[in-house]
Amino acid sequence: MAERPEDLNLPNAVITRIIKEALPDGVNISKEARSAISRAASVFVLYATSCANNFAMKGKRKTLNASDVLSAMEEMEFQRFVTPLKEALEAYRREQKGKKEASEQKKKDKDKKDCEEQDKSREEEDEDEERLDEEEQNEEEEVDN
């Protein structure tokens, strides 16, 4: 578990992408500044996690949840981020729900298709069996004649 900023290294590619998205086009950032932002982000993540963990512990839980993080943001005096975070959380939940429903529908469609294929296979087997019975009966009739 990361307890110090040095223990937590956020991926440089992610930090660089976030920085580029936040800055206007044509603005460059030095390697030293990028490193400082990365360290600051690490400190923020550790601090936010620690505060959120306090809320989870008050609730006698070992698992942090979204409400713990939102409460931590308010406690850290980042209230202005709570509303956008809630909106992002709701969007995430809707997306997950949509994915789950799509997955369930895909499974139902596959099960239905499998069932139809099994029914078709059984029908073909029954038809083959009937044909064989007819052929045997015809052969028996020919032998009798």
Curated annotation (Swiss-Prot):
GO cellular-component term (any): epsilon DNA polymerase complex
InterPro entries documented for this protein: CBFA_NFYB_domain (IPR003958), DNA_Pol-Epsilon_Subunit (IPR051377), Histone-fold (IPR009072)
Modified residues (N-acetylalanine): A2
PTM-bearing positions, type Phosphothreonine: T83
Compositionally biased region (Acidic residues): 124-145
Protein keywords: Acetylation, Coiled coil, DNA-binding, Nucleus, Phosphoprotein
One Pfam family it belongs to: CBFD_NFYB_HMF
Tree of life domain: Eukaryota
Coiled coil (residue ranges): 85-144
Composition skew (Basic and acidic residues), residue ranges: 93-123
Annotated GO MF terms: chromatin DNA binding; protein heterodimerization activity
Record-listed Phosphoserine modification sites: S121
Compartments where found: Nucleus
Positions of region (Disordered): 93-145
GO biological process, one term: chromatin remodeling
Primary location group: nucleus
Function (record text): Accessory component of the DNA polymerase epsilon complex. Participates in DNA repair and in chromosomal DNA replication. Forms a complex with CHRAC1 and binds naked DNA, which is then incorporated into chromatin, aided by the nucleosome-remodeling activity of ISWI/SNF2H and ACF1. Does not enhance nucleosome sliding activity of the ACF-5 ISWI chromatin remodeling complex.
Subunit structure: Component of the DNA polymerase epsilon complex consisting of four subunits: the catalytic subunit POLE and the accessory subunits POLE2, POLE3 and POLE4. Interaction with POLE4 is a prerequisite for further binding with POLE and POLE2. Heterodimer with CHRAC1; binds to DNA. Component of the CHRAC ISWI chromatin remodeling complex at least composed of SMARCA5/SNF2H, BAZ1A/ACF1, CHRAC1 and POLE3; the complex preferentially binds DNA through the CHRAC1-POLE3 heterodimer and possesses ATP-dependent nucleosome-remodeling activity.
PANTHER family: DNA POLYMERASE EPSILON SUBUNIT 3
Protein name: DNA polymerase epsilon subunit 3
Taxonomic source organism: Rattus norvegicus
